[in-house]
Amino acid sequence: MTNKTSLSYKDAGVDIDAGNDLVDRIKGVVKQTRRPEVMGGLGGFGALCALPQKYREPILVSGTDGVGTKLRLAMDLKRHDTIGIDLVAMCVNDLVVQGAEPLFFLDYFATGKLDVDTAASVITGIAEGCKQSGCALVGGETAEMPGMYHGDDYDVAGFCVGVVEKSEIIDGSKVTPGDVLVALGASGPHSNGYSLVRKILDVSNTNPEQTSLEGKSLADHLLEPTKIYVKSILSLIEQLDIHAIAHLTGGGFWENIPRVLPQGMQAVIDEASWQWPAVFSWLQHAGNVSRHEMYRTFNCGVGMVVALPAELADKAVELLTASGEKAWKIGVIATATEGAEQVIINP
């Protein structure tokens, strides 16, 4: 017998009206990220963006990323307002280490049932991250997919395109022995290592909202947005000859610094040059995590490392400090012996 009931998309769990409400909610914050190169507004099948005219040989640089299981912690604590900043930061920080200026950003927000308030909060954070990095939020996809996600769970991904002058690409090829390494301080764990963070919280039976570190909750420390270094780094690049920049993300010191080192080069890090922020000391103690594993999983307070000629190091620290960064000389580049590690951290 045929079912005569008339079904709609909403009956199947997809509320088009809610999606339209979300677009109306976010239009204002998205408009605040606009760049002069952007042509048109939200709603087109694709976003149009011209290249800035100041570039003679523009090279496009693209990247995509997520925020890992930091999102799970944010959902568990019902804090959705800063995860969008994390999303933008993870993408634009990867672009700027190559000397690229971020141009535009797109996001993907997927959920089983669209909660307009939650989605608007996340996308408002994305817009804030775009403002901090000077790139335009030109579009995105909101996917409501019944049966694909549990409860109120959602996932986010970001996509960014930037531009760099061909002759000014930073790829590490200029790194030489004697270069000094300058560190830029991190705001917290950023968006890496959160599966280990959550495991530590679980095995130590810790409620992050009821645990205090240096005057604020552990939850606040853990959900502190990833620092966006774009404006500080672009300003530095304009003024000094930068040989390489490493963004310390998944893989920590051991895996990210070698990505920008030529064969035969070694980064020698002076561990005594800085003190780990309290959140990392807490994680190491609560999880009984080895020193090697800490440096493999977390940034341990260092968000980026810049390599440049020794005679420019003091000026770099001065310029970065003036840009609002915590910056210091963290090590040097040396010639590596055959078979030696590319990163040495001296206690």
Curated annotation (Swiss-Prot):
Pathway in which this enzyme or protein is active: Purine metabolism; IMP biosynthesis via de novo pathway; 5-amino-1-(5-phospho-D-ribosyl)imidazole from N(2)-formyl-N(1)-(5-phospho-D-ribosyl)glycinamide: step 2/2
Substrates-to-products reaction catalysed: 2-formamido-N(1)-(5-O-phospho-beta-D-ribosyl)acetamidine + ATP = 5-amino-1-(5-phospho-beta-D-ribosyl)imidazole + ADP + phosphate + H(+)
E.C. number(s) listed in UniProt: 6.3.3.1
A single cellular component GO annotation: cytosol
Any Pfam family hit: AIRS_C
UniProt GO MF annotations: ATP binding; phosphoribosylamine-glycine ligase activity; phosphoribosylformylglycinamidine cyclo-ligase activity
Keyword hit for RNA-binding: no
Annotated localization: Cytoplasm
SUPFAM superfamilies with a match to the protein in the record: PurM C-terminal domain-like, PurM N-terminal domain-like
Class of this enzyme: ligase
Primary location recorded for the protein, binned into one broad class: cytoplasm
UniProt KW keywords: ATP-binding, Cytoplasm, Ligase, Nucleotide-binding, Purine biosynthesis
One of the protein's GO biological processes: 'de novo' IMP biosynthetic process
Family, per entry: Belongs to the AIR synthase family.
Alphabetized PANTHER family for the sequence: TRIFUNCTIONAL PURINE BIOSYNTHETIC PROTEIN ADENOSINE-3, TRIFUNCTIONAL PURINE BIOSYNTHETIC PROTEIN ADENOSINE-3-RELATED
Protein name: Phosphoribosylformylglycinamidine cyclo-ligase
